[in-house]
Amino acid sequence: MGSGGDLGGRTNSLRRLKRLNILFKLPYNTQWGQNLMIIGSDALLGAWVVEKGQRLMPRQEGDVLVWEVSISVSERFETEYNYVVVDDRFRGLRRESGARRVLSLPEGLSNGATVEVHDLWQDSPETLFTKEAYRKVLFGDEACKSTHIEGELSKDPTQCFTNVPLNPSAVVVQFKIANSVLHPDQAVFVIGSSSELGQWNNEAAIALSNTVGYSWECLVSISRTEFPVSYKYILKNSSGVVTYENDENRVLSLSLSAKKSSSVLIAADGSFRSKPWRGAGVAIPVFAIRSTESVGAGEFLDLKLMVDMAVKTGMRLVQLLPVNDTSVNMMWWDSYPYSSLSVFALHPLYLRLQALSNKLPNDIKEDIENYRKQLDMKEVDYEATLAAKLSIAKRVYNLEKDLVFNSALFKKYFDENKGWLQPYAAFCFLRNLFGTSDHSQWGLYGDFTQEKLDKLVSPMGDYYDAVAFSYYLQFHLHSQLAEVRDYAMKKHVVLKGDLPIGVDRNSVDTWQFPSLFRMTASTGAPPDYFDMNGQNWGFPTYVWEEMAKDNYGWWRARLSQQMAKYFSAYRIDHVLGFFRIWEMPDHAVTGLMGRFRPSIPLSTEELEREGIWDFQRLSTPYVRCHILQGKFGDRWTEVAENYFDEFEHLCYQFKEEYNTEKKIISATTLKDNASSFAIQEAEADRTRLFDLLHEVILMRDRDDPSKFYPRFGMDKTVSFDELDDHSKNVLKSKYNDYFFHRQEQLWRDNALMTLPALLNSSDMLCCGEDLGMVPACVQPVLSELGLLGLRIQRMPSAPGQEFGNPADYEYMTVCAPSCHDSSTMRAWWEEDEGRRERFFRNMLGLTDPPPETCDPHVSHLILQQHLESPSMWAIFPLQDLMALKDEYAKRPANEETINDPTNPRHYWRFRVHIPMETLLCDDDFVGIIRDLVVSSGRATSKDFDLSSSSIVPAVRDHELKHVNKTVSGKRLDDNKIIIDRTYSGEGLDVAKPVVATSYFNTIVTA
């Protein structure tokens, strides 16, 4: 028996494997010159190498191109795969979003049988709903917990074919659909034209089973004579209520080439077609929150109040600025939240002192309360607040450090975080010891080694108590922010963090990982809406080649080991920096004299071919006698003698000691006791000298003098104006090519190398801040990778537009009327009368003179425009929401600005003037926001109890004072909203429904 069994086993293993055909089919409209490839893990599909994949062939079916390819495989074939759009040279242009597809063949097929795989292109919106923000926070995995499912759940969908007999006269169809927005008592069904699908009878619909995650599948054997089959997916709840998916019927047809041999058809139908989900959120820096318990600035635990506000108003997200420690200079300069001392450590400014211990001595409690009262000021006093918190924390530390360090929670935290925590604590100790964060001045400790670190942080060392204080602070900060995370998740509110593009050059990260940073350069942005001189943030640029050696481990750790602990969504600050970064030499102060890295420069050869040869004239500041006279008037000879050398008659060059921006600043900075007039004159001279220093057309590459970069805005220089016409035309052409054409593929490739490593390192929803000078390659890449873009109405991305129209925004965006880098909605309204009138007329469609201030009526309309936009998220600064009520809009509007990007030393100290507890108790204010959110479809009555509140746009008593001015003669457009409640206000007595147009001063009876 044993021998026979062995022989039988060998015979079975040696039998010839059956050959099967797989026909991949995908509808996708490409552009001219583009093709589709299928690539995958198997060698037949190129082993993920695009050029070695299988090319699909197109054919026209109505208005759609349908792509097909057939491959012959063995019966044991299995693979992961995806589709890629390629150009005519088979270079990848666009990849599908989301996870890799998986294919395993069913058992029991006859030799030569065909398996048809009907796929749909995986777009970003479909895949985003598998992110933690939706899956765990917003929907709470409810889509995977349906209780109204008929049949058994199939945990391995590839094995379910074995239970279905294969009939030569029929085709076994596997229907596959994803649905992430599903209520617990709903299930997914398929219904269609064939008898097997119930012939459109809801009662005979076929139930799908939840397999894994949000995937739902079923098997149906359909007679070949029934094809083509029309069908739809539907949802049924326990009460029998049916919800049909949107759009036209789906159609399933057998391929002509395999009509007779097809045995199995896999209909991978993407996602359930429903109205796109949209949400609303509120944005606030932690430091700006005011509460009855916070000391001097907002604290992590204050975020619970923001979560409560979100819940009460129907908002589903709270967005923050970076929360990392920025204590580089130990003064108010550190209020800048984007200049990280450590990309892992949290900022002690956000510590809740009262939560350090439940056994605080009375004297410490009294001191905390005294500090709270003293620091309860209009704005944040950064230095005093941080000093108070560190002082109290140190006293509690001295009392309870042994208790904390011996706790299981601390030991677990330390073990999980010591890789960054120990270097951070050592850095803080050395910063305090040497009085500077500039580690180049630390002597022996200036160069980081593990041996030096181990000595510094040794529990046996003389400095351990000072080092361990940082452990203590970070543990409590972590505990408090983690408490907020858990609270927000329980309330189904997304916490959204912010990932800064740079780090301070005097930081833990540049000390510990110096090879990752280019310390002789500085990061910024070219001139744009924010600053006509460009921005220079002072951060070192990245050595991406070095980072790539460990697959961008430093970036991945930032996300997986820090941000993902607390947030389920994040914003990439200046996502354009992952395509290319604007880089200045370290002696620059402004951002004007920068270049893109990476970029393809202009070569000496290509310029000489076009008749450009005087590179010295073009690449050095163009300073001539008449230019000096125009700048300095009668003082020009004095200035020329002090700052310049005359290298030819009436031609000047900067002296060595004044030939950079930093040198000019040093030369024009007066002593503190100088008169205000002298200081003003020196600053005016500095500006004029900067202008002369910027009289450059081409900038030489510092590593290769034969390469040049066009100076941004070179055509606005006197140097350019005094060139001959031929040179102007050539240089202008090269300028346009450099900035707008020749870099596109390079920048696309660069982003596709770096961004996926970040995105794949966590399950957070990712949004990219893509404002400013945006290359053409950016939007396709963001869409391909599943990143949401940002749309600020006053900063439209389309050329020639003054204002963006929220109704035209793409779904994969976050929209807002303002952001932390701009003035608020109210302040912007007051800045420019002409612009205000154009906006009022062109964007609000109103002909009356606009109010001088952005009153609640105007604010209401602007917010409503954004809420009704197609954008996935509408996220509003809290200041813009407070503009909805006169009582909260009395503060001067310019005091609500968080940042002034034109000022590199801006003091980030804005603080909301109303405690959050007061806002939460204001039912009228909360109701206005809630009504706006609900009426826009970004929340429903199921999201909260609306039994005592209307769910229509807020037309409240204080908004009716001007109604009688425009009560007649207004056109009712497609945006009209029926309001089913009665109002009686000044000039209006309505006893039947009214129709409100988008501006609520315009109300007419219906």
Regions found by a protein language model. Name each.
Residues 5, 969-971, 985:
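Small-residue-biased low-complexity repeat regions
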Residues 29-78, 86-108, 181-227, 236-257, ...:
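Aromatic-rich carbohydrate-binding modules that target alpha-glucans
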Residues 146, 150, 162-165, 221, ...:
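Catalytic cores of glycan-processing enzymes that make or break glycosidic bonds
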Residues 2-15, 120-166, 193:
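Peripheral membrane interaction modules
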Residues 20-27, 171-179:
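A short, amphipathic beta-strand motif
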Residues 103-122:
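C2-type phospholipid-binding modules
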Residues 13, 154, 158, 965-968, ...:
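Serine/threonine-rich intrinsically disordered cytosolic regulatory regions enriched
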